Amino acid sequence: TLRRSRSFHCFSPRRDAMQGMRRLGLTGATGSGKTTIAEVLREGGFDILTVESLASENECIDAEDPRDGARPIDIVKLKTILVEAWADPPKKMTIVDGHLSHLLPVGGVIVLRCDPEILRDRLVSRDYSDSKVDSNIEWEFIGGAWNEYNPNIPWTEFETSKNSPVSIVGLIRSWISDGFKHDAPDTAIDWVEGGTGDV
């Protein structure tokens, strides 16, 4: 766990060239399906990076906190390093997997959302502490990464509670091939209103 301190179709090369390769943040609460979705994307030809590996490679991560098992990341330092390192676009479409990925210098953000009750079941099955389960449920309930929305890059979200990883990947591919259409916070899923919103 990381914490902040302060269809497998291939892309059409022609279409990819038109859109341009990007690094895309794949964010969402713990248990929302990020790593599973990332693995399906990897099998379909995407490059996959993780926030944890990037932080480790760039000496931006602390030792594990014995209280909750989290490894605090200096996300400000990491972002500063990557702004320079990522000045050029990647050679392949790249996914940056991690719930802090939307805070890095990515070219778009994919937010995975999950019904809080289903998310609770997933987290409890992992034997997480009550405090860790509750904090992740709260983060999902209030909108998760949308609270740190950056209007300068395209954002979109997908609901993973009832949709299979393969179907979600299909939607992600469609979003990319359709030109990264930009969602806005007011279209996001609102669990308080019963999960309404444009998915």
Task: State the predicted function of each range.
Residues 125, 150-199:
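NTP-dependent small-molecule kinase module
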Residues 32:
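ATP-binding Walker
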Residues 35:
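Walker A/P-loop
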Residues 29:
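P-loop (Walker A) phosphate-binding loop of NTP-binding proteins
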Residues 63, 114-156:
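A glycine- and Lys/Arg-enriched "phosphate-lid" helix/loop adjacent to the NTP-binding pocket
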Residues 26:
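Hydrophobic anchor at the beta1->P-loop junction of P-loop NTPases
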